[in-house]
């Protein structure tokens, strides 16, 4: 079978349709189809992790109607991956029976960092949930990161004192795909899933906490990332992708908000759109992902492979180095509600690569954004690219946030010593632009220093400064 082709007649019809549509018509169509601006829309996963779901659904419905308790839904307890997948399938299939009918919480836990008490795991008494505070922003900002159809909270088990991320998904939007990949595949660059608990009408997913926030949050608060920071993040994500792709898993939503900083690494999160391929080419029934990072072959819906993640990573690299996603500077969202047609006709967005990008990094990005997926490198190939393996003398001295903060303080002290007396004196009143910048930088150092000291968090990516 020709790659990316499901039949010559169908191909000719689609090409003919696209050829005769003008941009305004396409925009109107896409705006109606994708009225919601929430990225990463959930659709049922096509991977079958629990083949007897129909039989189990009938059995569960029968038990619920008879007033008997379903074993998976009677309490919060430790279990196997198979138990968790069975629980997820039952919750997803029996949504209509749960509204107002759950006297207490129930769930399956995979890790003993979560400590239930007598089959219960109650909010406030057993686990504390607080809105996630972005470490790069003012503590009072009240920022709560969002994933597809879910909020993320910081959770702490009251007995083990383990801090975790807790993603809340309304039960009517919960799908088994939300837990399948993380439960079945373990890797250091994939956020570990600790368990799932159903409280009332909301499923709570507990996983490794990325207390350093996401790449998107860092970009929004600190601006474009430096190249050695990008190298650090990219190597971690490519390791995760190499593992997933070796298992024939497509993540389908690689983007800055789904890359999270742990204490010493970067990890991938949000696997709700992921699928496990059963053949060399995945033939989708729907669009999966966030369109601004989508590859051309995903948009055409004629079939794609794990190479789609590589293209999305290339688009993410542009976002990291410029602080702006590809396409949006040249095609503002206000004028172009959808980028699907633009990506189909004009990809790859090589014009959006940063002007100060090194030759090696530019070569890597161009390779990742190769329009033909057959010519696009694998994750393992990109890991060997010279852009990600610079000479030792070119690597930064700072390998942690602590050392970066120390370096920042040293640089600030040096700048203050070099300032003329009249400017140094005016820094308290902010009478000059330079002194105002210095004052903000000092404030940033104090805020980050306090956070690092109190929470003992984030030791990556390596950077000379976070400002």
Swiss-Prot record:
Cellular localisation: Cytoplasm
Q: Provide this UniProt record's keywords sorted from A to Z.
A: ATP-binding, Cell cycle, Cytoplasm, Immunity, Kinase, Magnesium, Metal-binding, Nucleotide-binding, Phosphoprotein, Proto-oncogene, Serine/threonine-protein kinase, Transferase
Give the active-site positions: 253 (proton acceptor)
**What are the Protein kinase domain coordinates in residue numbering?**
138-388
Q: Which reaction does it catalyse?
A: L-seryl-[protein] + ATP = O-phospho-L-seryl-[protein] + ADP + H(+); L-threonyl-[protein] + ATP = O-phospho-L-threonyl-[protein] + ADP + H(+)
Q: Name one GO cellular component term.
A: cytosol
Binding residue positions for ATP: 144-152, 167
Residues the record lists as Phosphothreonine modifications: 80, 290
Q: Which cofactor does it need?
A: Mg(2+)
Give residues where Phosphoserine occurs.
141, 400, 443
* Record's note on what induces expression: Up-regulated by Il12 in T-lymphocytes. Up-regulated during in vitro adipocyte differentiation. Up-regulated in epididymal adipose tissue of obese mice.
**Root EC class:** transferase
Query: What Pfam families does the annotation carry?
Result: Pkinase
Q: Which Gene3D superfamilies match?
A: Phosphorylase Kinase, domain 1 (3.30.200.20), Transferase(Phosphotransferase) domain 1 (1.10.510.10)
How does it get modified post-translation? Autophosphorylated.
User: What GO molecular function annotation could you give as one example from this UniProt entry?
Assistant: protein serine kinase activity
The record's subunit annotation is:
Forms a ternary complex with NFKB1/p105 and TNIP2. Interacts with NFKB1; the interaction increases the stability of MAP3K8 but inhibits its MEK phosphorylation activity, whereas loss of interaction following LPS stimulation leads to its degradation. Interacts with CD40 and TRAF6; the interaction is required for ERK activation. Interacts with KSR2; the interaction inhibits ERK and NF-kappa-B activation.
The record's family statement is: Belongs to the protein kinase superfamily. STE Ser/Thr protein kinase family. MAP kinase kinase kinase subfamily.
Function of this protein? Answer: Required for lipopolysaccharide (LPS)-induced, TLR4-mediated activation of the MAPK/ERK pathway in macrophages, thus being critical for production of the pro-inflammatory cytokine TNF-alpha (TNF) during immune responses. Involved in the regulation of T-helper cell differentiation and IFNG expression in T-cells. Involved in mediating host resistance to bacterial infection through negative regulation of type I interferon (IFN) production. Transduces CD40 and TNFRSF1A signals that activate ERK in B-cells and macrophages, and thus may play a role in the regulation of immunoglobulin production.
Please identify the protein, giving its name as recorded.
Answer: Mitogen-activated protein kinase kinase kinase 8
Organism of origin is: Mus musculus
**Biological classification of the source:** Eukaryota, Metazoa, Chordata, Craniata, Vertebrata
């Amino acid at each position: 079978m020709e790659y990316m082709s499901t039949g010559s007649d169908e191909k000719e019809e689609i090409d003919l349709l696209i050829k005769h549509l003008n941009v305004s018509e396409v925009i109107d169509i896409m705006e109606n189809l994708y009225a919601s601006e929430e990225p990463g829309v959930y659709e049922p996963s096509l991977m079958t992790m629990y083949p007897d779901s129909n039989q189990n659904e009938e059995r569960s419905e029968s038990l619920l109607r008879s007033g008997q308790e379903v074993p998976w839904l009677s309490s919060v307890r430790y279990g196997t991956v198979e138990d968790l997948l069975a629980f997820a399938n039952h919750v997803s299939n029996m949504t209509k029976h749960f509204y107002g009918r759950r006297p207490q919480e129930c769930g399956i836990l995979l890790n003993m960092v979560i400590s239930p008490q007598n089959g219960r795991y109650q909010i406030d008494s057993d686990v504390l949930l607080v809105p996630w505070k972005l470490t790069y922003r003012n503590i009072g900002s009240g920022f709560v990161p969002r994933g597809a159809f879910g909020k993320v909270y910081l959770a702490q088990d009251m007995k083990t004192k383990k801090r975790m991320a807790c993603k809340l998904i309304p039960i009517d939007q919960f799908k088994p795909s939300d837990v399948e990949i993380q439960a079945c595949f373990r890797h250091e660059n994939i956020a570990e899933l600790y368990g799932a608990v159903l409280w009332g009408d909301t499923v709570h997913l507990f996983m490794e906490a990325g207390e350093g926030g996401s790449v998107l949050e860092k970009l929004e608060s600190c601006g474009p990332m430096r190249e050695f920071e990008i190298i650090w993040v990219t190597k971690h994500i490519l390791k995760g992708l190499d593992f997933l792709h070796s298992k024939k898993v497509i993540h389908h939503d690689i983007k800055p908000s789904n890359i999270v900083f742990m204490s010493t690494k970067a990890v991938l999160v949000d696997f709700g759109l992921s699928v496990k391929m059963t053949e060399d080419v995945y033939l989708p029934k729907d669009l999966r992902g966030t369109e601004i990072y989508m590859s051309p072959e995903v948009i055409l819906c004629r079939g794609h492979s794990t190479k789609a993640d590589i293209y999305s990573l290339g688009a993410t690299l542009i976002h990291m180095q410029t602080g702006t996603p590809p396409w949006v500077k040249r095609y503002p969202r206000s004028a172009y509600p959808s980028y699907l047609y633009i990506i189909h006709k004009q990809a790859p967005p090589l014009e959006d690569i940063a002007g100060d990008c090194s030759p090696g990094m530019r070569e890597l990005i161009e390779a990742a954004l190769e329009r033909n997926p057959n010519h696009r490198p694998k994750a393992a190939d990109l890991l060997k690219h010279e852009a990600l393996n610079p000479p030792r003398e070119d690597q930064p001295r700072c390998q942690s946030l602590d050392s970066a903060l120390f370096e920042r303080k040293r640089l600030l002290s040096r700048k203050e010593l070099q300032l003329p007396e009249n400017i140094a004196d005016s820094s308290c009143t902010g009478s000059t632009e330079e002194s105002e910048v210095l004052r903000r930088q000092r404030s940033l150092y104090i805020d980050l220093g306090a956070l690092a000291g109190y929470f003992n968090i984030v030791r990556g990516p390596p950077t000379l400064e976070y400002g």
